[in-house]
Amino acid sequence: MNKDTRIAMLTRLRDENPAPTTELNFSTPFELLIAVLLSAQATDVGVNKATDKLYPVANTPKAILALGLDGLKSYIKTIGLFNTKAQNTLKTCQMLIDLHDGEVPAQRAALEALPGVGRKTANVVLNTAFGLLKDDQGQYFIAVDTHIQRLANRTGYAKGKTVEQTEQNIIKNTPRKTEFFFNLHHWFILHGRYTCVARKPKCGSCIVEDLCDFKEKTS
Protein backbone atom coordinates (compact mmCIF):
# COMPACT_ATOMS: atom_id res chain seq x y z
CA MET A 1 0.00 0.00 0.00
CA ASN A 2 1.46 3.35 -1.03
CA LYS A 3 1.07 6.80 0.50
CA ASP A 4 -1.86 7.89 -1.67
CA THR A 5 -3.74 4.67 -0.95
CA ARG A 6 -3.22 5.10 2.78
CA ILE A 7 -4.61 8.63 2.62
CA ALA A 8 -7.59 7.37 0.62
CA MET A 9 -8.20 4.67 3.22
CA LEU A 10 -8.10 7.12 6.13
CA THR A 11 -10.31 9.56 4.23
CA ARG A 12 -13.02 6.94 3.77
CA LEU A 13 -12.84 5.88 7.40
CA ARG A 14 -13.13 9.54 8.41
CA ASP A 15 -16.09 10.16 6.11
CA GLU A 16 -17.89 7.16 7.58
CA ASN A 17 -17.12 8.14 11.19
CA PRO A 18 -15.92 11.76 11.55
CA ALA A 19 -15.70 11.75 15.35
CA PRO A 20 -14.74 8.26 16.53
CA THR A 21 -14.16 7.44 20.16
CA THR A 22 -13.73 4.49 22.45
CA GLU A 23 -16.71 2.24 23.15
CA LEU A 24 -15.72 2.08 26.81
CA ASN A 25 -17.96 4.22 29.01
CA PHE A 26 -16.06 6.83 31.03
CA SER A 27 -16.33 10.42 32.20
CA THR A 28 -12.90 11.00 33.80
CA PRO A 29 -9.32 9.91 33.09
CA PHE A 30 -9.52 7.63 36.14
CA GLU A 31 -12.66 5.91 34.89
CA LEU A 32 -11.02 5.35 31.51
CA LEU A 33 -7.83 3.99 33.10
CA ILE A 34 -9.75 1.44 35.16
CA ALA A 35 -11.96 0.49 32.21
CA VAL A 36 -8.92 -0.16 30.02
CA LEU A 37 -7.30 -2.18 32.81
CA LEU A 38 -10.43 -4.32 32.99
CA SER A 39 -10.70 -4.69 29.20
CA ALA A 40 -7.75 -7.07 28.70
CA GLN A 41 -9.13 -10.32 27.24
CA ALA A 42 -12.64 -8.95 27.69
CA THR A 43 -15.15 -7.13 25.50
CA ASP A 44 -15.99 -3.47 25.87
CA VAL A 45 -19.63 -4.48 26.27
CA GLY A 46 -18.73 -6.72 29.20
CA VAL A 47 -16.57 -4.05 30.81
CA ASN A 48 -19.31 -1.44 30.43
CA LYS A 49 -21.85 -3.72 32.12
CA ALA A 50 -19.52 -3.95 35.11
CA THR A 51 -18.45 -0.31 35.29
CA ASP A 52 -22.01 0.95 34.79
CA LYS A 53 -22.72 -0.63 38.19
CA LEU A 54 -19.33 0.11 39.77
CA TYR A 55 -18.84 3.79 38.92
CA PRO A 56 -22.07 5.14 40.48
CA VAL A 57 -20.83 3.59 43.73
CA ALA A 58 -17.07 4.12 43.41
CA ASN A 59 -15.31 6.11 40.69
CA THR A 60 -12.27 7.49 42.52
CA PRO A 61 -9.17 5.75 43.86
CA LYS A 62 -10.27 6.36 47.46
CA ALA A 63 -13.78 5.05 46.87
CA ILE A 64 -12.61 1.90 45.10
CA LEU A 65 -10.08 1.20 47.86
CA ALA A 66 -12.90 1.51 50.37
CA LEU A 67 -14.72 -1.35 48.63
CA GLY A 68 -11.90 -3.74 49.47
CA LEU A 69 -10.90 -6.75 47.40
CA ASP A 70 -14.08 -8.76 47.83
CA GLY A 71 -16.26 -5.71 47.34
CA LEU A 72 -14.54 -4.80 44.08
CA LYS A 73 -14.70 -8.39 42.85
CA SER A 74 -18.45 -8.41 43.33
CA TYR A 75 -18.73 -5.72 40.64
CA ILE A 76 -16.26 -7.14 38.12
CA LYS A 77 -16.69 -10.91 38.59
CA THR A 78 -18.33 -11.23 35.16
CA ILE A 79 -15.09 -10.08 33.48
CA GLY A 80 -12.32 -12.51 32.60
CA LEU A 81 -9.30 -12.60 34.92
CA PHE A 82 -11.27 -10.61 37.48
CA ASN A 83 -9.19 -11.82 40.43
CA THR A 84 -5.94 -10.46 39.01
CA LYS A 85 -7.64 -7.34 37.69
CA ALA A 86 -9.15 -6.59 41.09
CA GLN A 87 -5.75 -6.85 42.76
CA ASN A 88 -4.10 -4.65 40.13
CA THR A 89 -6.91 -2.10 40.35
CA LEU A 90 -6.54 -1.75 44.11
CA LYS A 91 -2.75 -1.47 43.86
CA THR A 92 -3.15 1.13 41.12
CA CYS A 93 -5.58 3.13 43.25
CA GLN A 94 -3.15 3.10 46.17
CA MET A 95 -0.26 4.25 43.97
CA LEU A 96 -2.36 7.05 42.49
CA ILE A 97 -3.11 8.30 46.00
CA ASP A 98 0.44 7.88 47.30
CA LEU A 99 2.29 9.27 44.29
CA HIS A 100 -0.12 11.45 42.31
CA ASP A 101 -2.60 12.95 44.79
CA GLY A 102 -5.29 10.62 43.49
CA GLU A 103 -5.01 11.89 39.92
CA VAL A 104 -4.11 9.98 36.76
CA PRO A 105 -0.69 11.15 35.52
CA ALA A 106 -0.23 12.25 31.92
CA GLN A 107 3.34 10.95 31.78
CA ARG A 108 4.16 7.63 30.14
CA ALA A 109 6.65 6.38 32.73
CA ALA A 110 4.28 7.15 35.58
CA LEU A 111 1.41 5.38 33.85
CA GLU A 112 3.46 2.31 32.94
CA ALA A 113 4.64 2.05 36.56
CA LEU A 114 1.05 1.29 37.60
CA PRO A 115 0.20 -2.42 38.08
CA GLY A 116 -1.30 -3.94 34.95
CA VAL A 117 -0.54 -0.91 32.78
CA GLY A 118 1.60 -1.52 29.71
CA ARG A 119 2.38 0.57 26.67
CA LYS A 120 -0.99 0.02 24.98
CA THR A 121 -3.00 1.01 28.04
CA ALA A 122 -0.80 4.05 28.61
CA ASN A 123 -1.23 5.06 24.97
CA VAL A 124 -5.02 4.76 25.17
CA VAL A 125 -5.14 6.95 28.28
CA LEU A 126 -2.76 9.55 26.85
CA ASN A 127 -4.69 9.74 23.57
CA THR A 128 -8.29 9.37 24.69
CA ALA A 129 -8.30 10.90 28.17
CA PHE A 130 -5.76 13.67 27.58
CA GLY A 131 -6.03 14.22 23.81
CA LEU A 132 -2.31 13.81 23.18
CA LEU A 133 -0.49 12.89 19.96
CA LYS A 134 2.95 12.84 21.61
CA ASP A 135 4.01 11.65 25.04
CA ASP A 136 5.94 13.70 27.58
CA GLN A 137 9.21 12.62 25.92
CA GLY A 138 8.08 14.17 22.65
CA GLN A 139 7.52 10.81 20.95
CA TYR A 140 4.52 10.20 18.73
CA PHE A 141 2.50 7.12 19.64
CA ILE A 142 -0.45 5.00 18.52
CA ALA A 143 -2.20 2.51 20.80
CA VAL A 144 -2.05 -0.86 19.01
CA ASP A 145 -4.22 -3.76 20.13
CA THR A 146 -4.98 -7.09 18.41
CA HIS A 147 -7.58 -5.50 16.12
CA ILE A 148 -5.17 -2.82 14.92
CA GLN A 149 -2.31 -5.29 14.62
CA ARG A 150 -4.44 -7.51 12.39
CA LEU A 151 -5.95 -4.74 10.29
CA ALA A 152 -2.71 -2.86 9.68
CA ASN A 153 -0.92 -6.00 8.51
CA ARG A 154 -3.83 -7.48 6.56
CA THR A 155 -4.60 -4.33 4.60
CA GLY A 156 -0.94 -3.51 4.04
CA TYR A 157 -1.25 -0.15 5.79
CA ALA A 158 1.68 -1.00 8.06
CA LYS A 159 3.54 -4.25 8.57
CA GLY A 160 4.95 -5.55 11.83
CA LYS A 161 5.47 -8.91 13.49
CA THR A 162 4.97 -7.37 16.93
CA VAL A 163 2.65 -4.64 18.15
CA GLU A 164 5.70 -2.46 18.77
CA GLN A 165 6.88 -2.83 15.16
CA THR A 166 3.38 -2.22 13.87
CA GLU A 167 3.02 0.90 16.01
CA GLN A 168 6.26 2.37 14.69
CA ASN A 169 5.31 1.64 11.08
CA ILE A 170 1.84 3.12 11.52
CA ILE A 171 3.47 6.26 12.91
CA LYS A 172 5.87 6.32 9.96
CA ASN A 173 3.05 5.91 7.43
CA THR A 174 0.52 8.36 8.89
CA PRO A 175 0.53 12.16 8.43
CA ARG A 176 1.17 13.69 11.84
CA LYS A 177 -0.51 16.71 13.40
CA THR A 178 -3.72 15.77 11.60
CA GLU A 179 -7.12 14.31 12.45
CA PHE A 180 -5.91 11.18 10.66
CA PHE A 181 -3.16 10.59 13.20
CA PHE A 182 -5.32 11.44 16.21
CA ASN A 183 -8.29 9.28 15.18
CA LEU A 184 -6.57 6.32 13.50
CA HIS A 185 -6.57 4.27 16.71
CA HIS A 186 -10.35 4.42 17.02
CA TRP A 187 -11.04 3.98 13.29
CA PHE A 188 -8.87 0.89 13.08
CA ILE A 189 -10.25 -0.67 16.26
CA LEU A 190 -13.86 -0.20 15.15
CA HIS A 191 -13.17 -1.38 11.61
CA GLY A 192 -11.29 -4.40 12.92
CA ARG A 193 -13.98 -5.17 15.48
CA TYR A 194 -16.96 -5.03 13.13
CA THR A 195 -15.75 -5.42 9.54
CA CYS A 196 -12.16 -6.67 9.24
CA VAL A 197 -12.79 -9.41 11.80
CA ALA A 198 -10.30 -12.17 12.47
CA ARG A 199 -11.81 -15.31 10.97
CA LYS A 200 -14.16 -14.20 8.20
CA PRO A 201 -13.59 -10.56 7.32
CA LYS A 202 -16.65 -8.89 5.81
CA CYS A 203 -14.90 -7.78 2.65
CA GLY A 204 -18.17 -7.50 0.71
CA SER A 205 -19.35 -4.65 2.94
CA CYS A 206 -15.95 -3.05 3.55
CA ILE A 207 -15.62 0.58 2.47
CA VAL A 208 -11.88 0.17 1.79
CA GLU A 209 -12.00 -3.26 0.14
CA ASP A 210 -10.64 -1.97 -3.18
CA LEU A 211 -7.68 -0.32 -1.42
CA CYS A 212 -6.74 -3.34 0.67
CA ASP A 213 -3.81 -5.69 -0.06
CA PHE A 214 -5.52 -8.74 1.49
CA LYS A 215 -5.46 -11.50 -1.13
CA GLU A 216 -8.00 -13.87 0.43
CA LYS A 217 -11.00 -11.56 0.28
CA THR A 218 -14.41 -12.90 1.20
CA SER A 219 -17.75 -12.01 -0.32
Where are these regions (language model features)?
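Catalytic cores of DNA base-excision repair glycosylases
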Residues: 2-219
